Swiss-Prot record:
Record protein name field: Endochitinase 3
Function: Defense against chitin-containing fungal pathogens.
Similarity comment: family membership: Belongs to the glycosyl hydrolase 19 family. Chitinase class I subfamily.
Cell compartment(s), UniProt: Secreted, Cell wall
Lineage: Eukaryota, Viridiplantae, Streptophyta, Embryophyta, Tracheophyta
């Protein structure tokens, strides 16, 4: 899923 707050995919977290 894409994270609007960071501009990156939440899978990277």
């Amino acid at each position: 899923m894409y994270d609007e707050s960071t501009g990156y995919s939440s899978a990277l977290k």
